[in-house]
Amino acid sequence: MSIVVKNNIHWVGQRDWEVRDFHGTEYKTLRGSSYNSYLIREEKNVLIDTVDHKFSREFVQNLRNEIDLADIDYIVINHAEEDHAGALTELMAQIPDTPIYCTANAIDSINGHHHHPEWNFNVVKTGDTLDIGNGKQLIFVETPMLHWPDSMMTYLTGDAVLFSNDAFGQHYCDEHLFNDEVDQTELFEQCQRYYANILTPFSRLVTPKITEILGFNLPVDMIATSHGVVWRDNPTQIVELYLKWAADYQEDRITIFYDTMSNNTRMMADAIAQGIAETDPRVAVKIFNVARSDKNEILTNVFRSKGMLVGTSTMNNVMMPKIAGLVEEMTGLRFRNKRASAFGSHGWSGGAVDRLSTRLQDAGFEMSLSLKAKWRPDQDALELCREHGREIARQWALAPLPQSTVNTVVKEETSATTTADLGPRMQCSVCQWIYDPAKGEPMQDVAPGTPWSEVPDNFLCPECSLGKDVFDELASEAK
């Protein structure tokens, strides 16, 4: 069944209430989706996009109920991905000579999916127009890498409707088509989820492309997206949100996520969160176990956050696989203006936290001090985790902290013995980690104030796991 969008524009798309996976299994569409196709009937009849390939036959049959297929004069393909152009083969089998208007890159993508180079392709570029009669034109705007190289938008003069492709859309299924008809909380939650998980890597392109489109000085009464609602009520509100999200977006929020084998790393996460909340009660803190949480919700929270803490147990000297996979995905999303800290527990040897810190730094995060615990953290170790959270809260504060938290008393780390009496600091000759007698190494039950001579012989360097024999007196303190 078609829905009138405006005047002679009809929605002829497909709702998909059941879909739960998108882009393979990388995006969870918890509220379904829609594949929006539009039929414009003027002196010339234009079809903008089709639907997902799994609905090809149903789409063509429904379209035949709306219009004699032979009366379709032009097909516009804003994007060649299968959820947009998937029904082309089924449709073109009925009307093989119908002109297809798309970008040059789209021809490559369409042929790659459908293998019909004989189709009547017509390449368009930014500023090109197509007269469709009754004084109306289609104006094409290339939008490469938002989010594919072939992407473009199409603007209809007279009706002032922007067919925006993936931009401004959301994977959200509802019987109502327009933004003012649906649950606003659900809608904007899905808009942000969509941007965070799909468009974040291209944020540097969003602002100049929107500026370019606004530079045409064309009125926009509606934005007709490829997924989700049509924006008819104050359509520029979603444009303003995109400009905000593209500008290195962050809220006063910290996301903590982890994976754990024996709940030790979970205990650390809880204690760190307590320290953050104790020091800065204004900050929102969200905690996720990656094995039990929706990955896209985690990534959306990272997008919203000023920083994140990532925890992992050590398994075979490396991080847990789910954490490794999530870090790889964040590398591709190219988050900006975010801070990060790694933490985790280990047994006889470590390695995961250092590896995780390196990977997070490579992913573009500004790194803060990491934290490790050996075996199951006891009360002293948990207090160190809380203190780590307090320090993170202080370092990452976006505004001066409330005075009551600035003066929080922190447990003294050094004994009454003077630093000089404790002897020199010792440095690992392999990884350069420094043992400070004044601080000790509580994770290995070496109390603050323990001189090197009293450190147990089974002590291991926290960074490289080698023994005491690789340590030398710190050069700057050698006599």
UniProtKB/Swiss-Prot annotation:
Signal peptide: none annotated. It comes from the Bacteria. The keyword Repressor does not apply. Residues 30-210 are annotated as: Zinc metallo-hydrolase. Residues 254-393 form the Flavodoxin-like domain. Fe cation 1 binds at H79, E81, H147, D166. Pfam families: Flavodoxin_1, ODP, Rubredoxin. FMN binds at residues 260-264, 342-369. One of its GO terms (cellular component) is cytoplasm. Its main location: cytoplasm. The keyword Cytoplasm applies. Fe cation 2 binds at D83, D166, H227. It is found in: Cytoplasm. Pathway: Nitrogen metabolism; nitric oxide reduction. Its cofactor is Fe cation; FMN. Coiled coil: none annotated. GO terms for molecular function: electron transfer activity; FMN binding; iron ion binding; nitric oxide reductase activity. Residues 423-474 form the Rubredoxin-like domain. Keywords: Cytoplasm, Electron transport, Flavoprotein, FMN, Iron, Metal-binding, Oxidoreductase, Transport. Fe cation 3 binds at C428, C431, C461, C464. Binds 3 Fe cations per monomer. Binds 1 FMN per monomer. NCBIfam families: PRK05452.1 (NF003954). In the N-terminal section; belongs to the zinc metallo-hydrolase group 3 family. Homotetramer. Anaerobic nitric oxide reductase; uses NADH to detoxify nitric oxide (NO), protecting several 4Fe-4S NO-sensitive enzymes. Has at least 2 reductase partners, only one of which (NorW, flavorubredoxin reductase) has been identified. NO probably binds to the di-iron center; electrons enter from the NorW at rubredoxin and are transferred sequentially to the FMN center and the di-iron center. Also able to function as an aerobic oxygen reductase. This is Anaerobic nitric oxide reductase flavorubredoxin. The lineage of its organism: Bacteria, Pseudomonadati, Pseudomonadota, Gammaproteobacteria, Enterobacterales.
